[in-house]
Amino acid sequence: MQTLYGDAWVIGGIGCVTADLPQGNDLAAVKRHGANHGCRTCNVSNDQYTDPNYNYIKNARFQQQTNERIAEIESQHLRMDQDRLATKYGLIKPGPLNDLKWNQHLQTPQDAYHSMAGKARTLLEVTFNIFNTNGENDFLEYWKRIEKPSHWSRMPNPLRHRQSFMFSDVLRLAMLMPFILQRFLESCHIKTDALNNWHKNSGIRRNLVASKLCACWAIEAKALKLAFSTTMTENTYQELQETLKKNERY
C-alpha cells in the first residue's frame, strides 16, 4: 500500500476495525449518517431508519457490490456525474485500508453503543420538546430530587444543556427518566398541539398520553440495560429481542 514514505508491504490481517461514528463510515467508504444512504452495513435510506419492516438482510451492503459501484463512480468523466452516483449509492472515495484484502462492511461493523445511545438521545429530545412550561419546571424539580449513584459525575440541567451531553450522560439520564416521569407527568405538563397530534396520528386519548410516554421510557431503559449487560446469555439475548420489538410499537 502507498504511504507518505513510499510503498509499503503489509503482512498480517485485520480482524475487526473499531471506529466511532462517523469515522467508521469513512473507513468503509460510505457517506456519513446524515446522507440519503448513511448506513455502512446496508442500503437503507434515511427516511426508513425507523421502519421496523425494512429488510436490512436482503438490502445489505456487500463488498463486491460496493467495489463495482466505486468503479462505476470513478469511470465517470464529469464530476457532476460522479457526485450524482456517489449520492445515489451513499459512497465516498475509498480510504487507505481499501488497498488491503478486507471486507469494509463486515470488518467495520455498526457498534451498539452509538446506535442505542443515539436512539436514547433522540427520545430525550422529543420528550423535552413536548413539555410546556409547567412540564419543564416540574421535571427539573424532580430531576434535582431524585437519588443518583454517588460515583456519577454531576450533570448540568438537561433541559438547557443536553446538546453538550456525552453519550455516557445520555445513558445515565435515560435510566432515570422512567422514575422521574412516573413521579409527576400528567397531560397538563404536555403541550396541547402534542396531545392533539398523538390523538390524530395514533388514536391515543389525551388523558392516556402521559402513561404511554412513561411506559415507552420504561421499555427504553430496560432495552439499554439488557444491551449493555456485562454478560450476555441466550436468555438475555431473547429478552432483548422481545424488548426491542415492544419498543418499536411505541
Task: Report each predicted region and the residues it spans.
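Terminal interaction-prone segments of large eukaryotic proteins
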Residues: T133-Y250
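Charged (Asp/Glu and Lys/Arg) segments that form or flank catalytic channels of large polymer-
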Residues: M1-F179, C188
